[in-house]
From Swiss-Prot:
<feature type="topological domain" description="Cytoplasmic">
    <location>
        <begin position="362"/>
        <end position="415"/>
    </location>
</feature>
<feature type="domain" description="Fibronectin type-III 1">
    <location>
        <begin position="29"/>
        <end position="120"/>
    </location>
</feature>
<feature type="glycosylation site" description="N-linked (GlcNAc...) asparagine">
    <location>
        <position position="241"/>
    </location>
</feature>
<keyword id="KW-0472">Membrane</keyword>
<keyword id="KW-0675">Receptor</keyword>
<feature type="signal peptide">
    <location>
        <begin position="1"/>
        <end position="17"/>
    </location>
</feature>
<dbReference type="InterPro" id="IPR015321">
    <property type="entry name" value="TypeI_recpt_CBD"/>
</dbReference>
<feature type="glycosylation site" description="N-linked (GlcNAc...) asparagine">
    <location>
        <position position="128"/>
    </location>
</feature>
<dbReference type="InterPro" id="IPR013783">
    <property type="entry name" value="Ig-like_fold"/>
</dbReference>
<feature type="disulfide bond">
    <location>
        <begin position="266"/>
        <end position="313"/>
    </location>
</feature>
<dbReference type="GO" id="GO:0032674">
    <property type="term" value="P:regulation of interleukin-5 production"/>
</dbReference>
<dbReference type="GO" id="GO:0004914">
    <property type="term" value="F:interleukin-5 receptor activity"/>
</dbReference>
<feature type="domain" description="Fibronectin type-III 2">
    <location>
        <begin position="238"/>
        <end position="331"/>
    </location>
</feature>
<feature type="glycosylation site" description="N-linked (GlcNAc...) asparagine">
    <location>
        <position position="213"/>
    </location>
</feature>
<keyword id="KW-0812">Transmembrane</keyword>
<feature type="short sequence motif" description="Box 1 motif">
    <location>
        <begin position="367"/>
        <end position="375"/>
    </location>
</feature>
<feature type="short sequence motif" description="WSXWS motif">
    <location>
        <begin position="319"/>
        <end position="323"/>
    </location>
</feature>
Length: 415
């Protein structure tokens, strides 16, 4: 049986090679080529084989070329193809019939079709669209224990009127959902959307399509599409039940995996130990969910852990959020620091007490009596001063010193 199949394959290859070398064999382009939007950021390309194509029992293929919004090309044996791409700028594609051999490829002419861009005034569509997802507990735990929440934010178009209102939709697979919970700016325009639970599969490889359109009485609002990889926007939850214990000079840290549909072995962890006293940060990359570290007994430490999904379970993603900090230890002064603080304080206290005792008991007067001032007899002498009316040119002051009993007359002075 196997030799027969090999003979048939060889014969077919020989026939195709002969056809390619035959100048009269002509490939005709497909017919009825159409492009139809089948969902948010999704189109279906369909065509039919040319009914006038000569049939010689050969395997015809089709070469599809995407011209806009982003160039791409591929081959297919089917007569239809599905494309996932933003459509707010329109879509254009071409297709042709091809016949391949080991040496060359014969191709027909191209046929093209396009999907025009939706109407709307320039500058009215949203900008800076960003989305993130989180794993949450499902409301139907017996069917599906985990679901995914979705939050998207955007900026209002620079030329959008003040009465513009935006509306968000997302599509994942065949399911489409409209946003019901919005956040608004000062002009009451929607600028963020929140889905507490969605149909998104955080383990899936399908792209998430987000579509935002709008309405206004003053202008036509141009819609906007954007595709997201669930892996790229998945925000891993922080590890749960982080516990920290201190025994002697050892720090024992343990935690549980984040709330996630992935099992325990699918996570890598990063541990951060921050010494609040000296500012030193210790970071450790771990696979296990426990860690032991040596510490001193005079510092306080802040402990945090975060997680990321590892490569065995899916393509590595970004790190998730840090867990809430846990503070352990009691900050105490070292012996040298205590000496530097206690000794000067004690010295000042002793001096203050001694000063108060001396003041109360008059010890300063007893220890350091005041030196008596020398006695002066001159102060005891009565002095009489007489004034005479001076002339116009001369002023004369006469001072008489009167001698008392037991004192020597000091004399008279005249100026």
């Amino acid at each position: 049986m196997v030799p027969v199949l090999l003979i048939l394959v060889g014969a077919l290859a020989t026939l195709q090679a002969d056809l390619l070398n035959h100048k009269k064999f002509l490939l005709l382009p497909p017919v009825n080529f159409t492009i139809k939007a089948t969902g948010l950021a999704q189109v279906l390309l369909h065509w039919d084989p040319n009914p006038d194509q000569e049939q010689r029992h050969v395997d015809l293929e089709y070469h599809v070329k995407i011209n806009a919004p982003q160039e791409d090309e591929y081959d297919t044996r089917k007569t239809e193809s599905k494309c996932v791409t933003p459509l707010h700028e329109g879509f254009a594609a071409s297709v042709r019939t091809i016949l391949k051999s080991s040496h060359t490829t014969l191709a027909s002419s191209w046929v093209s079709a396009e999907l025009k861009a939706p109407p709307g005034s320039p500058g009215t569509s949203v900008t800076n669209l960003t989305c993130t997802t989180h794993t949450v507990v499902s409301s139907h735990t017996h069917l599906r224990p985990y679901q995914v929440s979705l939050r998207c934010t955007w900026l209002v178009g620079k030329d959008a009127p003040e009465d513009t209102q935006y509306f968000l939709y997302y599509r994942f697979g065949v399911l489409t959902e409209k946003c019901q919970e919005y956040s608004r700016d000062a002009l009451n325009r929607n600028t963020a959307c929140w889905f507490p639970r969605t149909f998104i599969n955080s383990k899936g490889f399908e792209q998430l399509a987000v579509h935002i359109n709008g309405s206004s009485k003053r202008a036509a609002i141009k819609p906007f599409d954007q595709l997201f990889s669930p892996l790229a926007i998945d925000q891993v939850n922080p590890p749960r039940n982080v516990t920290v214990e201190i025994e002697s000079n050892s720090l024992y840290i343990q935690w549980e995996k984040p709330l996630s549909a992935f099992p325990d072995h699918c996570f890598n962890y990063e541990l951060k130990i921050y010494n609040t006293k000296n500012g030193h940060i210790q970071k450790e990359k771990l696979i296990a969910n426990k860690f032991i570290s040596k510490i001193d007994d005079v510092s306080t430490y802040s402990i945090q852990v975060r997680a990321a999904v590892s490569s065995p379970c899916r393509m590595p993603g970004r790190w998730g959020e840090w867990s809430q900090p846990i503070y352990v230890g009691k900050e105490r002064k070292s012996l040298v620091e205590w000496h530097l603080i206690v000794l000067p304080t004690a010295a000042c206290f002793v001096l203050l007490i001694f000063s108060l005792i001396c003041r109360v008991c008059h010890l300063w007067t007893r220890l350091f009596p005041p030196v008596p001032a020398p006695k002066s007899n001159i102060k005891d002498l009565p002095v009489v001063t007489e004034y005479e009316k001076p002339s116009n040119e001369t002023k004369i002051e006469v001072v008489h010193c009167v001698e008392e009993v037991g004192f020597e007359v000091m004399g008279n002075s005249t100026f």
